[in-house]
A protein has these predicted regions:
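Positively charged n-region of N-terminal signal peptides that target proteins for export
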Residues: 1-7
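Bacterial N-terminal signal peptides
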Residues: 8-18
């Protein structure tokens, strides 16, 4: 049985979905219809920052207004054993992660509401509402706090009306305006004006029209497809390329009808890709594609890698707490994450900008924390600027913040080639001591070739070779032996070869020529779905061949199209093949995103109820 807050939420959503339709000519191609998309945690926080006119950096927000404590108690910091850690920043709000679909958030089929999520949305709304009082963009008058009471109320209402339209990403409907005004007057009657403003903002931030992207489209009677309305197109485009709401320019373009043509959509898509907000949004997609959004959870063992970072492999006394290894691994993990982000951003926005470069470029970033992983052959590039970020690490349950500087670098061409040889990707495909060819191979097949390998058979994990430093053979030989039974071969003849391609990299992503005293064998061959065969000598050769594979490029297009629509499209979805053929000929990633924005799949949707066209 649904909890009370969840039942209320569902009722409100049903009211929002039944808005009036409009009319337009039908188009032949549209993606299957889904339930309304909820804002993801990243989209919610970005939208809040843009709505209130604050930067996407909690350290640069103002302090919580004094009135905030009357609406919402401050979030408690996690408690340390010895010294309390600093309190969490006022932004972003930390929501529970979405279940996701195929590794991606923001996909309708992977969004499952919960009572806990609804409660967190309420807490977040109450927390952020008071910031409207100190927002540089909220009030439509310059000096609201010093105005006479009547003028304050007039200005506040005008500001709330404008705020609601921006929050809902469309003009208010007459009934919405009436309800909002009644809510505002009830709050004014109940308490001080600043509190009334904050409570009304909190109500707006809890409305389904804010939290959900409802897309009824412009449907004529009898049409099987409907063009999205101008406001829906603006919203879909902004969350596709920015992970946030439209800016004033895009709102104006929607209002004037500029988005009604593919040329208008293309013009604004190109403008938006040049905006700084596109960079973190595109990086965010690639974190989900590669799984590197989980890199802060990797746990290489001290007994295997302690000496690499200048400490003994074991504690001097078994009763001692290990304080050194967490202090080392905290910056290493964060550096891995930032190196991934900077590589993707620089390659797409400041480099070649192609899928080929994404999988083959041997430039990137490193820090003092990860320098031991890259080794002596990595060359820093002093002509390019360094990047310094603040990170948070936890040692002995004590949180602390420190700076981390990353340096542009060039790596040997026989050791690094694109995202698949980043330490973040390699460490995620490993155990505490040994690399995991099965983990790495499965990731390549599923994320790069769109080949779902399913779950392992019962007891498969128990048959894996032990994750130990002492072994009589190479990691490849042990894995091959463990997966040789007849019950395993059907899957592992596909999974093992792409995993073995990266045997030159240990569990932390360091390149190695030998494994257990024997030369590494990273060669192999693989037949992708559709019959495309790839033969390779090592991970570098494999990455270069994947970069030009039609199957792999088609898969990348499929991931991006699903992400843009928030819909787990089938591989055979109408309209998809044209996008894939174009990307085979021109692998510019920006051009792919523009092509998706221009497509019927992006601009249209079926009429009828969700599921009718699936």
């Amino acid at each position: 049985m649904l909890s009370r807050p969840l039942r209320v939420w569902c009722i409100l959503l049903s009211l929002a979905v039944t808005g009036g339709g409009r009319s337009s000519a039908a188009e032949p191609v549209a993606a299957p219809r889904t339930a309304p998309l909820a804002l993801t945690p990243a989209e919610y926080n970005n939208t809040i920052a843009d709505l209130l006119g604050f930067p996407r950096d909690g350290d640069r927000w103002p302090a919580r207004p004094a009135i905030a404590d009357t609406l919402s108690p401050p979030r408690a910091a996690s408690k340390g054993v010895f010294v309390p850690p600093p309190p969490p920043p006022v932004w972003p709000w930390r929501f529970p992660a979405e279940p996701g679909s195929d590794g991606f958030e923001g996909i309708a089929q992977g969004q499952n509401p919960s009572s806990y999520q609804v409660e967190e949305l309420h807490h977040a709304a109450m927390h952020f509402a008071s910031f409207a009082l100190v927002s540089p963009t909220f009030f439509s008058c310059a000096t609201w706090a010093t105005l006479p009471a009547t003028q304050q109320e007039t200005c506040a209402w005008m500001s709330l009306e404008r705020f609601a339209e921006r929050a809902y990403r469309r003009p208010l409907r007459a009934q919405e305006r009436e309800r909002l005004e009644a809510f505002w007057h009830a709050n004014i009657a109940a308490g001080p004006r600043d509190q009334a403003v904050a409570l009304t903002v909190a109500g707006i931030l809890q409305a389904p029209a804010f939290h959900f992207r409802v897309e009824p489209g412009d449907a004529s009677a009898g049409d099987t497809t409907a063009g999205l309305s101008k406001w829906e197109l603006a919203t879909r485009l902004s969350y596709f390329l920015w992970d946030s709401m439209p800016d004033e320019t895009l709102f104006a373009a929607a209002d004037s009808g500029q988005l009604a043509t593919t040329e208008g959509l293309e013009r604004h898509a190109r403008r938006m890709l040049e905006d700084p907000k596109a960079r973190p949004a595109i990086v965010h997609f690639h974190h989900q594609w590669l799984g590197t959004d989980k890199v802060l959870l990797v746990a290489p063992a001290r007994r295997a890698f302690g000496p690499l970072f200048g400490i003994s492999p074991r504690l001097d006394n078994a009763r001692d707490d290990d304080l050194k290894w967490p202090a080392i691994m905290g910056p290493v993990r964060h550096s891995m994450q930032l190196e991934t982000e900077l590589f993707v951003e620089q390659t797409i926005f400041d480099g070649a900008g192609t899928f080929n470069a994404l999988l083959t470029d041997n430039h990137g970033y490193m820090s003092d924390a990860t320098a031991p992983i890259y080794g002596a052959h990595a060359t820093r590039i002093p002509a390019r600027p360094t990047v310094t970020r603040t990170i948070e690490i936890v040692v002995a349950s004590i949180g602390r913040r420190q700076s981390l500087t990353l340096y542009p670098a060039e790596f040997p061409r026989n050791e690094r080639a694109g995202v698949l040889t980043l330490p973040s990707v390699l460490a995620l495909g490993a155990y505490a001591v040994q690399p995991g060819p099965i983990l790495r191979g499965k990731r390549v097949l599923e994320r790069l070739a769109c080949m779902d390998m399913g779950a392992p058979i019962q007891g498969a994990e128990a048959a894996l070779p032990p994750d130990t430093l002492t072994a009589e053979s190479t990691n490849r030989q042990r894995t091959a032996a463990a997966t040789s039974p007849a019950a395993c071969t059907a899957c592992h003849k596909l999974i093992n070869p792409p995993g073995f391609a990266f045997e030159h990299y240990d569990a932390i992503g360091r390149w190695r020529a030998q494994d257990n005293g024997q030369p590494v064998d990273a060669s192999g061959s693989l037949t992708l779905r559709g019959g495309e065969e790839i033969t390779f000598t090592d991970g570098i050769d494999f990455a270069r061949k994947l970069a030009t594979s039609n199957r792999v490029r088609d898969c990348y297009v499929l991931h991006w199209t699903r992400y843009a629509l928030g819909n787990q499209l089938e591989e055979t979805a109408p309209g998809l093949e044209a996008l894939q053929e174009r990307f085979r000929e021109n692998d510019s990633i920006k051009e792919l995103l523009v092509s998706i924005a221009r497509s019927d799949l992006f601009r249209m949707r079926p009429t009828g109820n969700p599921g009718d066209n699936r």
